Amino acid sequence: MTEAKAAWNALRDTPATSLTELFTNEPDRLSRLSMEEAGILFDFSKTHLSAALIDRFAALAEASGFAARRDALFAGAAVNVTEDRAAEHPAERGQGAPDSVARARGFHARMRGMIDAIEAEVFGPIRHILHVGIGGSALGPDLLVDALGRDAGRYEVAVVSNVDGAALDAVFRRFDPQATLLVVASKTFTTTETMLNARSVLAWMEEDNVEDPYSRVIALTAAPEKAVEWGIDETRILPFSESVGGRYSLWSSIGFPVALALGWDAFEELLEGAAAMDRHFRLAPPSANIPLLAAFVDQYYSVLRGAETRAVFAYDERLRLLPSYLQQLEMESNGKGVKADGSPVDGPTAAITWGGVGTDAQHAVFQLLHQGTRLVPVEFVAAIEPDHVLDDAHHRTLLVNCFAQGAALMAGRDNGDPARAYPGDRPSTTILLDRLDPGRLGALIAFYEHRTFANAVLLGINPFDQFGVELGKEIARSIESEGTDRFDPSTRALIARALG
């Protein structure tokens, strides 16, 4: 038996204890499981992590080679074993191999120079930024601009990812093509949806007689030669390293629209906040390592308690896109069926991540969370300081509801009426930012990245490839080029009905 299997067996043998009993039996529970880093409070005390479980998960982490894999990540080793690449996103924050950090800083300097040129109206009087990308080339910028760019007052930014023409059409109705800069974000610069959207934006500009539309295009890519082939001048290309994965790329040139919308100082604060979480993840021991503890929680509920999903509720309208961002980060990274060595995984991997915005979600899905038969670990994310000038009652009511939901999930209530009974003993984690600003949001996103990595180490899988997304794209291309004869009757009938 391997050490990792022995550690899992020890975890399975650990008796389950209710949350109320844990608070009774562990007087120091709140102080041990509520910790702060980079202006963010993480409260794990309402999860079933006992002192004994933490010790046994720490043994699992040791048996899984966690420390060595973490060090390899920051050293720039080829931790993406299936593609023989490093995962250099920490280097974008100054936390990585010296050569990688130096290269990232060079790319950032090029970004800053481009922003200076735009602000100097080298591209003409730009008011609108239209960013087209998909997946990691869009979700990160969209989250950050939506969360932090509301009052920046610099440029109006639209992020379009869907190939559905309705998405672009909605932007065309409110943007002026004469004042629009097109940003094309694609790691390979061959992404079907992105390139089709980019061509449509150029056609829209041409229809309005924009002089030389290609001079209004900025390319963000790890394949600059492809952007040149596509017709973009080398001086309009912002490259980034091929070893920066798409869903980890918002710190790289992919973050260009964020820096443009918020200003360079804000982008640097974002990087600094993430770097603070990087340092914590590198140096903190297992019992106080926030991303690793979060991974312990994930593995406990997924593997040992059979939870198939995890719900994230942002009690802050500015973070409404956070659940969508986390869906890609977590499920594309860890939704795998084989280990890094190619052997099959013998248990569940990534849970299904979903969520919404509080208090809206309370009136939609919390019925299931409180009284349903499925175990759903819940994560609450909130900020202490509001960003609006409305009556304080708005923010107070928001936070009171957030904290009340966590208390209710844990305590439950039995009043003698089965239809009105709440079983309780339902877990939640609360993440409380002092305020939502670039630094703290950077730290929060880096926390989720490292949590995802820690989960992968405990499971023995590679979180940096995504081969599962390829087959559907290949079939879509073959439908266009080869016809439908080789497909099943259902697929052929659907294509015939919709496409003729």
UniProtKB/Swiss-Prot annotation:
Transmembrane segments: none annotated. It is found in: Cytoplasm. Pfam families: PGI (PF00342). One of its GO terms (cellular component) is cytosol. Its main location: cytoplasm. SUPFAM superfamilies: SIS domain. It comes from the Bacteria. It catalyses: alpha-D-glucose 6-phosphate = beta-D-fructose 6-phosphate. The active site is at 332 (proton donor), 363, 473. InterPro entries: G6P_Isomerase (IPR001672), G6P_Isomerase_C (IPR023096), Phosphoglucose_isomerase_CS (IPR018189), SIS_dom_sf (IPR046348), SIS_PGI_1 (IPR035476), SIS_PGI_2 (IPR035482). One of its GO terms (biological process) is gluconeogenesis. GO terms for molecular function: carbohydrate derivative binding; glucose-6-phosphate isomerase activity; monosaccharide binding. Its EC number is 5.3.1.9. Pathway: Carbohydrate biosynthesis; gluconeogenesis; Carbohydrate degradation; glycolysis; D-glyceraldehyde 3-phosphate and glycerone phosphate from D-glucose: step 2/4. The keyword Transmembrane does not apply. Keywords: Cytoplasm, Gluconeogenesis, Glycolysis, Isomerase. PANTHER family: GLUCOSE-6-PHOSPHATE ISOMERASE. Belongs to the GPI family. NCBIfam families: PRK00179.1. Catalyzes the reversible isomerization of glucose-6-phosphate to fructose-6-phosphate. HAMAP family: G6P_isomerase (MF_00473). This is Glucose-6-phosphate isomerase. It comes from Rhizorhabdus wittichii (strain DSM 6014 / CCUG 31198 / JCM 15750 / NBRC 105917 / EY 4224 / RW1).
